[in-house]
């Protein structure tokens, strides 16, 4: 995303950069720059967004093909030219369109070091809103392509445009074997000294300390994990110089070397101006050399979609290079370089340079210092914390799509090596899976998942997501489930759209619903299915009748939903049956009269709750289960809104613990999809003719609060109606089903929409003494946040928005002082939001945003007219217990059971159906323990017997007394009970033989171990390990 240079305006009037660096650095007695020739490594590159102000198809056809055609042609003709390429989605698309002759030429360019791949992912993924599994997916796509086509293993990260660097990226890149990492967008007050404003104390510490390069130790959980990191000192465009306008001191002028840009600011090099242009270039190099602890400079040469006219760029720069290199008095030597050449040079310096360390710290919130803001507010005041939430429906759809992709990956991988005697064509499934992978990778792009692209581009992203999900839902999942459950016949009648079946049923009909569990833990949890209003009963996979409940949801267009608990084996499938009963509760299907007596679904009538002026402050509405209650009261100060008021901890016999939750509303000052800038403090969202409903039943209890036609909240509490895990064996010591249950949390289903210049947030208020400390996660690790005033910026909007941080899926506040009854409030989400604690005891999640302000780069307002359902899970109570269960609950919440439906013909007795088709598929010998998560089980290539398997120990150091410890796991036997003597490779998989195991880097492009067929591994807290498994079916 770009990147109009004049809009940065790090003007010398504002940043007295030259003076500061000369005064503060040249006098540093440890400087290694003095009296040395400056070695300039010019990095030719083109930053190619996968959509932004145009769609990626438009960018590809109009720009990228031109760039690659011309650059490759130039490199072929001139071996002195070099180029660095990042976005592999574009490169692979282009590559597949080339002749075998040109492909051979390109391979030569790669082999001789002229064409160099940096990063190597599908995209430069966003770091503030993207889930780590999606990051791994998109990096694996790119890395596998580079490995298969060129034998290339990338080793340098190139994240030059994402809006703030996360520790997650540095951690994952380290696990991929990267040695070096280049970043760019950090708070510009970290980079530059603003000494015209004495109130910005401490600005420019990277300049003062010459710390634009540092050793980054990103993980609190692995102190040995590190990556050498370089911060671009002046963005990723070609060199430029900004200087005061002598005729107008309120303006500045820019001159530079972006030869495809405005020629008045970037004049072509000729004989008449070469001395002047060389002097400017050398001046820039001399200034920038003062920022580093050595005399080598990494200088980007390019910009957004540059090098469409490759000869123009190279020809002009050739003249400068020749002229400057031929005159040693300049003290500068320049060379075209690939990124690795720069880092290899820096690494070879003797004696080694000492660098600063950054430990466990990310670099959010990004702030761009625009001249207009600086002149208006005397500070930057441009906090990019808005994009953590912007366009939540897009973020939700992308996360749901990734969950669906995971289901498809698991089913495809399990099906390919499953022997049941039936022929099956896997080509269609692999095509659908490949497309879904590609779309998942595209959506990680830093202008896609962020919601920062133009509207029609965002629509294009939705179209991609819908097409990918449709293929997976219409073909992959139904077909693979039918294949895996086939016994005496191949079941091809499944479909993912249950409404088409359920809405056409008649009394006596029986619908089979098969639920796929993509997580390697046994699961028992409540599901809901939209149904027509009919009498029903539910049977499990063994035809046992089970309790169910029918609820009318007034917050969901008054539709009816069926709730019941489902048990599924780890990574497996369970089939449940819905029987349509007569009006008097009888089974009318003559072929199914042998079914046990049904338990008719309980019809729970939702009673409307009406405010009564005679109600006193003690009048309470309560929903609950055996663990806790939620208590609600009418709020006379907010139009008599029914409001959460307190919590009863029944397990610890603590009654009436204060907790409330309100929807609040900010008014925009000049918000856009990137930045969050509001007028002031929020106010409670005022309901218009509110309605309230209470639903009580054996499976679920609900309080529904309807603010208006497009805004509501429903609180749901589930009861545990299943007393044991049917899949546990005598040898299973994990006892997973008893640790994680869905009666441990309450759910809030927010259905929200914003008016113009309004932003809606959900705010929890408790008596937790969090001392302005709160926690959000980067998807993998919890990050400690501290509410504070940054850079002495006391504008009210800055105090608010500078303290919002990305919450990928988890956030919480906790009592900071030990007491007899410490409390913790934990919020789990299925998508990223901005989150904060603005006041002691409060936790806030920004849900949806809309603004009429026209953003300068996309030239559109943030006009989000969606009305999404945004669900969160809430865990309240003891911190030790909350931290023990929050991570497994988060994984399960993000990866729901995936149903497929089939109408059983009335002519087939139910007994014959379950004899023809299995009702259970159990691929693992036993459920994994809750601290061991099967992150990936993917057959990446259609013609390979290998599976990429990733395992992660999901608990952090100190998170849980019981689970924050190392795990021993025998991939051959599946034994996680420290039994290292089992050499009989029965496999932890039930239906599959494992003939070879190789440990690899995270993106599976480098081997870390020799092949074996039985491997005992140890995973420390939060450690990820990746393996290639060679599988074959058990006969």
From Swiss-Prot:
Q: Which UniProt keywords apply?
A: Glycoprotein, Glycosidase, Hydrolase, Metal-binding, Secreted, Signal, Zinc
* Any one GO BP annotation for this protein: mannose metabolic process
Q: Where in the cell is it found?
A: Secreted
Give, as one word, the top-level EC class: hydrolase
EC number(s) given by UniProt: 3.2.1.24
GO-annotated cellular components: extracellular region; lysosome
Gene Ontology molecular function: any one:
carbohydrate binding
How far does the signal peptide extend, from start to end residue? Answer: 1-20
Q: Which prosthetic group or cofactor does it need? A: Zn(2+)
Superkingdom, taxonomy of origin: Eukaryota
The residues forming a coiled coil are: none
Query: Is Coiled coil among the key words of this record?
Result: no
Matches recorded under InterPro entries = Gal_mutarotase_sf_dom, Glyco_hydro/deAcase_b/a-brl, Glyco_hydro_38_C, Glyco_hydro_38_cen, Glyco_hydro_38_cen_sf, Glyco_hydro_38_N, Glyco_hydro_38_N_sf, Glyco_hydro_57/38_cen_sf
Cofactor binding note from Swiss-Prot or TrEMBL: Binds 1 zinc ion per subunit.
Give the reactions, separated by semicolons, that this protein catalyses.
Hydrolysis of terminal, non-reducing alpha-D-mannose residues in alpha-D-mannosides
Glycosylated sites: 19, 30, 63, 245, 250, 270, 309, 327, 438, 487, 497, 503, 710, 719, 735, 792, 852, 863, 880, 962, 993
Protein name, UniProt field: Alpha-mannosidase B
The organism is Dictyostelium discoideum
């Amino acid at each position: 995303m770009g990147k109009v240079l004049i809009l940065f305006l790090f003007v010398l009037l504002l940043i007295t950069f030259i003076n500061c660096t000369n005064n503060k650095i040249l006098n540093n007695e440890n400087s290694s720059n003095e009296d040395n020739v400056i070695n300039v490594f010019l990095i030719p590159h083109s930053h190619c967004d996968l959509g932004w102000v145009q769609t990626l198809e438009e960018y590809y056809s109009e720009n990228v093909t031109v760039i690659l055609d011309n650059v490759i042609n130039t490199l072929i003709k001139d071996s002195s030219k070099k180029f660095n390429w990042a976005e592999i989605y574009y490169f692979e698309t282009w590559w597949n369109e080339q002749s075998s002759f040109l492909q051979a030429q390109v391979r030569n360019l790669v082999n001789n070091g002229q064409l160099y791949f940096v990063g190597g992912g599908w995209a430069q993924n966003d770091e503030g809103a993207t889930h780590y599994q999606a990051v791994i997916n998109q990096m694996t796509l790119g890395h596998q392509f580079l490995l298969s086509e060129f034998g290339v293993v990338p080793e340098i990260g190139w994240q030059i445009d994402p809006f703030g660097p996360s520790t997650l990226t540095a951690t994952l890149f380290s696990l991929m074997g990267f040695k070096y990492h280049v970043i760019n967008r950090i708070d510009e007050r970290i980079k530059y000294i603003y000494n015209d404003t004495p109130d910005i104390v401490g600005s420019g510490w990277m300049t003062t300390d010459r710390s634009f390069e540092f050793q980054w130790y990103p993980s609190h959980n692995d102190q040995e994990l590190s990556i050498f990191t370089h911060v671009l000192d002046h963005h990723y465009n070609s060199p430029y110089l900004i200087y005061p306008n002598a005729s107008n001191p309120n303006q500045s002028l820019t001159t530079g070397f972006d030869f495809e840009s405005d020629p008045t600011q970037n004049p072509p090099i000729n004989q008449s101006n070469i001395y002047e242009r060389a002097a400017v270039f050398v001046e820039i190099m001399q200034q920038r050399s003062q920022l580093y602890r050595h005399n080598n400079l990494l200088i980007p040469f390019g910009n957004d979609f540059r090098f469409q006219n490759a000869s123009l760029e190279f020809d002009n720069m050739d003249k400068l290079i020749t002229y400057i290199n031929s005159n040693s008095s300049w003290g500068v030597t320049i060379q075209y370089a690939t990124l690795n050449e720069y880092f290899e040079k820096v690494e070879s310096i003797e004696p080694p340079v000492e660098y600063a360390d950054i430990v466990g710290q990310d670099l959010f919130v990004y702030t761009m210092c625009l001249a207009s803001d600086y002149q208006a507010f005397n500070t930057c005041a441009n906090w990019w914390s808005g994009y953590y939430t912007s366009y939540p429906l897009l973020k939700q759809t992308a996360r749901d799509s990734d969950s669906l992709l995971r289901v498809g990956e698991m089913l495809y991988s399990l099906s390919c090596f499953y022997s049941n005697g039936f022929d099956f064509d896997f080509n269609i499934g692999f095509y659908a899976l490949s497309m879904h992978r590609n779309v998942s990778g595209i959506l990680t792009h830093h202008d896609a998942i962020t919601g920062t692209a133009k509207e029609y581009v965002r629509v294009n992203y939705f179209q991609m997501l819908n097409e990918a999900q449709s293929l997976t839902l219409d073909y992959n999942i139904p077909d693979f489930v039918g294949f895996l459950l086939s016994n005496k016949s191949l079941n091809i009648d499944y479909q993912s759209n249950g409404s088409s079946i359920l809405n056409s049923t008649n009394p006596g009909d029986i619908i089979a619903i098969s639920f796929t569990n993509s997580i390697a833990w046994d699961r028992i949890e409540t599901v809901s299915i939209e149904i027509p209003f009919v009498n029903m009963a539910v049977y499990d996979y063994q035809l046992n009748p089970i309790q169910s409940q029918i609820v009318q949801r007034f917050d969901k267009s008054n539709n009816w939903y069926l709730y019941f608990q489902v048990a599924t084996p780890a990574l497996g499938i369970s089939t449940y049956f819905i029987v349509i009963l007569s009006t008097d509760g009888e089974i009318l299907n003559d072929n199914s009269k042998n079914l046990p007596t049904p338990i008719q679904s309980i019809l729970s009538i939702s009673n409307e709750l009406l405010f009564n002026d005679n109600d006193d402050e003690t009048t309470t509405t309560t929903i609950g289960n055996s663990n806790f209650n939620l208590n609600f009261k009418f709020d006379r100060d907010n139009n008599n809104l029914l409001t959460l008021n307190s919590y009863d901890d029944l397990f610890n016999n603590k009654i009436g613990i204060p907790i409330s939750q309100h929807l609040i509303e900010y008014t925009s000052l000049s918000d856009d999809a990137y930045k969050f800038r509001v007028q002031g403090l929020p106010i409670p969202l005022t309901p218009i003719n509110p309605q309230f409903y209470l639903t009580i039943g054996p499976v679920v209890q609900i309080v529904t609060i309807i603010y208006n036609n497009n805004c509501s909240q429903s609180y749901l509490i589930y009861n545990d109606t299943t007393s044991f895990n049917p899949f546990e064996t005598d040898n299973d010591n994990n006892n997973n089903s008893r640790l994680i249950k869905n009666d441990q949390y309450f759910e809030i289903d927010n259905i929200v929409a914003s008016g113009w210049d309004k932003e809606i947030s959900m705010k929890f208020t408790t008596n937790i003494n969090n001392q302005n400390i709160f926690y959000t996660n980067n998807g993998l690790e919890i990050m400690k946040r501290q509410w504070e005033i940054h850079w002495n910026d006391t504008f009210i909007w800055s105090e608010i928005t500078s303290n919002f941080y990305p919450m990928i899926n988890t956030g919480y506040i906790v009592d900071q002082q030990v007491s007899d009854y410490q409390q913790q409030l934990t919020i789990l989400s299925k998508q990223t939001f901005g989150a904060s604690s603005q006041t002691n005891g409060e936790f806030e999640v920004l849900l949806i945003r809309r603004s009429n302000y026209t953003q300068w780069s996309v030239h559109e307002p943030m006009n989000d007219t969606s009305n999404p359902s945004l669900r969160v899970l809430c865990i309240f109570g003891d911190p030790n217990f909350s931290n023990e269960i929050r991570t497994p609950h988060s994984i399960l919440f993000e990866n729901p059971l995936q149903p497929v439906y089939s109408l059983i013909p009335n002519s087939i007795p139910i007994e014959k159906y379950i004899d023809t088709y299995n009702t259970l598929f159990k691929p693992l010998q036993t459920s994994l323990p809750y601290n061991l998560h099967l992150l990936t089980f993917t057959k990446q290539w259609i013609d390979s017997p290998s599976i990429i398997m990733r395992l992660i120990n999901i608990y952090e150091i100190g998170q849980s007394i019981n689970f924050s410890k190392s795990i021993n796991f025998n991939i051959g036997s599946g034994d996680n009970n420290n039994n290292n003597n089992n050499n009989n490779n029965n496999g932890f998989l039930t239906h599959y033989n494992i003939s070879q195991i190789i440990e690899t880097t995270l993106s599976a492009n480098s081997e870390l171990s020799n092949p074996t067929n039985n491997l005992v591994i140890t995973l420390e807290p939060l450690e990820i390990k990746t393996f290639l498994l060679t599988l074959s079916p058990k006969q």
